[in-house]
Amino acid sequence: MEFPKSFIRASEAYNTFEHHVPAPYLRRAFQIDHEAKANVIITALGFYELYLNGERITKGRLAPYISNPDDLVYYDTYEVTLRAGENVLGVWLGNGFTNNPGGHIWDFDTAAFRAAPQMALCLTYTDKSGEAHCIESDETWRTESSPLLFDDYRFGEIYDGRLEIPGWNTIGFDDSAWKFAERAPQPRGEKRLCTAEPIDIVNELKPISVTKTEKGYLYDFGINTAGVCRLCVRGELDQCIELRHGEHLKDGLPDVENIWFKREHWARDLEYVHKDVYTCRGDGEEVYTPAFTYHGFRFVLVSGITEAQATEDLLTALEMHSLLEERGGFSCSDEIANKLQQMTRQSDVTNFYYFPTDCPQREKNGWTADAALSSEHILLNLGAERSYREWLRAIVKAQDNNGALPGIVPTSGWGFAWGNGPAWDSVLIELPYRLYQYRGDLDSAKLCAPAIIKYLHYLTTRMDAHDLLAIGLGDWCPPGREAHEYKSPLAFTDTVLSKDMADKAAFLFDKLNMPEQAAFARALSKRWKAAVRKYLIDENTMLAAGNCQTSQAMAIYYNIFEPAERKAAFEQLINLIEEKEYHLDVGVLGGRVLFHVLTDFGYSDLAFSMITRPDYPSYGNWIARGATTLWELFQPEGSDRIGSLNHHFWGDISSWFTQALSGIRMAPHGEPNEVDFCPSFISRLTHAEAFHIAPADRIASAWERDADDVIVLTVELPSTMHGVIRLESGYVFEDGLAYKAAESGTYRIHSIE
């Protein structure tokens, strides 16, 4: 099938806050003399809903894949059956990513690609004689305004049920009064078939309570989630119902101050943000489901309804996200840890809308560091590889001529002057590395290889006289401080992570048979390690610059210290933890490595306690304060700084649970056919178990203490994979050994301490 020749639109006028332009309907009727199979290619700048003879056939919701159309234009394909006689194609267009004034803080309101929604479509079928026919988007299509008067991807919708056009997409409808569509300029981006998983509704939630307030009726759905609400109401003509979404309450009402945008526009934004508005036509039961937006929320304040209408059945929360397969899981005998695993999964999926976003209620942006930090635990738990591969194309396309990357992808151009740097840009290498490690995928590394080389060269132009780098964001969101007030010096985190990128790039270049590039990357790694050791490590005390948990843990994790130095360096890390009374004191970069370092030195009990303890700051404290998803910030209770209450970039604890507690260590030397089992039998647990579905098959590890305090370990390993079972200090198998070649089976383990 060929890509459609032309894009069409209702007009060039696009929706703004000041001038609402309704979402257009487009339709095309045509005749065939027999039933036939047909293929449809469709894309849109904006979102589309596709109908054939009145039936919605769109794959999922919020189609097509979100991208910068100057870089990439994604299309979808459908197989349909045409009836003999008249057939009707109907398309409903929303503004989507390419016209969202609600994204003004990231310059999406001034994007070069900003335009009215438009679409391109081609339907092909073969007649009885074998001749091919094509129904294509052109000026013969008819268009009319829909009842959707305003739609913004980030903010919400305004829908007027009184303006509905019954049968607009069906056979026999009279569209003679509709105007003809007009041609739209072709986007310049590469046209690609979308292979990422679609977004769709995955669950329906009924409210756990409905409470009358001064402002309306508060619906509480019991969990922080993402999606839309379906409104079912028997309303009066002209009755206007507003749905205001929020993830936390202030004075008993949803409060959106925690997701404020630019203060100079806040009064205007507040009229729209997280609000859907429906006006009733008053002719019986009416059902409204927003089509071209989504929200992050737990609570919905419904205003404009009567007490009789305020029933549980009025509103249903529809959870939406990319349709990612379940690939892993963890559980244990501690309910706090189990709850944190559930919270991590909820944050992961409710922030996965084609690609990992930072949060579903504020930005909905593809922040690069967030994805890099979460890549391992997401690949352990979810089948995200197809979506990651598509997003990597967008990252490569977004790279500028100098080799720099923006902090968000896709972008309108925002994110080069601020919001990037090595910790964020590492996604270019981290994702291909993890995709090879967990899925055996080298195609992603091949796709990114030219961009990786370009990026490494770019970093060499940004080094100071000491070969150090300090060009981006650092250890973001430390406890109790402003997000940018990190203790670990930027030169430390940037240079250490650049060294790690060079190491992983060299590994991938070796796999791709690119020896010159691998040698170049290794030389950079040595250079950056030497610079950190010379200028940012005190070799007398074995303390890293900043004298903080993040610097010390990162220096150990990323092998800045030499083997003979690691014990002394770790002792300093323990001292730093003791100074904080065994609380974590890290931002997101330190949080990614701290607990793994503790486990590597036999301190999994301490790591578990730091994670699950109920007092501030800790993950367990979030639970004590009612969290159902991971939060953006560790702030004390009562703080004015709340931040997002649904962020996934702290979620590597899920990886730690699987790797440290159940012991599943995928690809310990980088190879996807290898797995080690190294469980930590920590004192607070009586059992722990996890699984991961690898390309070869299911991998699992489960252990429990029996009545004699013997630990029974059960391992499940595909026959095509290999590895070892390695016990931590103080434990042996029944034969007295602490190390075995891994095989599926059950093992009895004894303590020797």
Where is each model-derived feature located?
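Extracellular/oxidizing-compartment recognition motifs
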Residues: 1-362, 370, 386-389, 406-413, ...
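Non-catalytic C-terminal accessory modules of carbohydrate-active enzymes
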Residues: 111, 115-122, 133-167, 192-197, ...
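C-terminal capping/lid segments that line or modulate ligand- or cofactor-binding pockets
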Residues: 159-160, 363, 381, 427-429, ...
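Active-site acid/base region of carbohydrate-active enzymes
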Residues: 47, 138-140, 144-145, 299, ...
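Alpha-helical support elements that line or immediately flank enzyme active sites
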Residues: 39-42, 228-247, 292, 303, ...
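Short helix-capping and inter-helix turn/linker motifs at the boundaries of alpha-helical repeat units
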Residues: 18-20, 221, 365, 422-423, ...
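Helix-terminus loop motifs that line ligand-binding clefts
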Residues: 58-70, 253-270, 385-481, 487, ...
